[in-house]
Amino acid sequence: MTKTNSNTDVDYEIMIVGGGPAGISTWLHLHKYYPELAEKTVLIEKAKYPRDKLCGGGVGGWSELILKHLGVQLDIPSLFISDLEFRYGKEMNTLHQPNCFRMIRRNEFDHALAKHAINRGLQLNENEKFLNMNRRNKSLKVKTNKREYLIKTLIGADGALSIVRRKMKLPNKSHLVPTLEIFAEANSRYDSEFDEKKIVLDFTPIKEGLQGYIWHTPCIKDHKPFIGHGIANIRFCKDKSKGNMKEIFTKELLSRNIHIEKKLWSSHPIRCLSENDTISKPNILLVGDAAGVEPATGGGIHFALSYGEVAANTIVNAFQINDFSFKDYKQRFQSHLAGKYLAKCTYLANQLYVQGISPLEVAREIFMIN
């Protein structure tokens, strides 16, 4: 589905590295606010759509509002969820909010989003990997596995293990959250999530030293009901016990009669944004997981879409005033709904993993949509 340009030596003004929700959202917002800049933007994606991404698959929060604002309607298999069930040992609490989550498969979601952008003119180069960058006067020389580009602005939207971020040589230490996940066909004897259209977040592992939770999320895969089973260890407090993720997850899967070898489990980190993190340098912005998401649960799709909006506005302003220092980028993000929500979740993560406040109380606060 790559849209190619016959002039391989062309220099763009802007490059986006990564074709996930954050990268595509950045381009779609540029196209909405400043079409002339969108025309001078190239997006490179190291893989070819559709490609798998480890993700719980919940499109929640204010995601639908952003997609509506962008005029994007996604015709993909979806399951709408109205109930979030929180568990902590034998305690249980349910938060009911009509259609608060839309459960999708990331390979289908990302592919559909990219198609919308291409139909509006996105220059997308698939199977092209970012390798390095060097400063050249007030611009950047970017090298990929296919060619070199001379650009004014580089957006790192290449995930938690961002190569762009690594090449920026930032001073702050990363907060990476390990996760494990498997997908299994729903078994009505053990899995009630699909039939009851609910998401289960189980914080019981906190009792075993884990600073995190187990999730069970229903979805549709190959036209069949499936459940995504996963575990995340947030490690918000570095001085506390880490807990044994694999042992806890194995026990949870066995309780649902799931016997999948560990070598078949998927694993990929989530990056959480800390207060002192640097997410920009002159000519360079980080978005989505490359920048970081909230440290209470590690939820990310609504953050990815929001980063795109903030980044696009920041870039438009930079071109208008000819100042590419991007010194105001983090402040712009902190002032945005996503930034304010992240600050709230950081406070709640401290309450949950450090202060020992009831997970059921904290979880409701995290997911309550005002």
Where are the model-predicted features located?
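Glycine-rich FAD pyrophosphate-binding loop
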Residues: 15-19, 29-55
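Conserved N-terminal glycine-rich FAD pyrophosphate-binding loop of Rossmann-like flavoproteins
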Residues: 47-70
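A conserved beta-strand/loop capping segment in the N-terminal third of enzymes
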Residues: 64-112
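Predominantly flavin-linked oxidoreductase catalytic cores and closely associated redox partners
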Residues: 29, 116-256, 292-293
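FAD/FMN-dependent oxidoreductases across multiple families
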Residues: 130-132, 237-314
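C-terminal helical "tail/cap" subdomain of flavin- and related membrane-associated enzymes
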Residues: 316-370
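N-terminal Rossmann-fold NAD(P) dinucleotide-binding loop
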Residues: 23-24
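Short beta-strand to alpha-helix junction loop
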Residues: 56, 96-116, 236-244
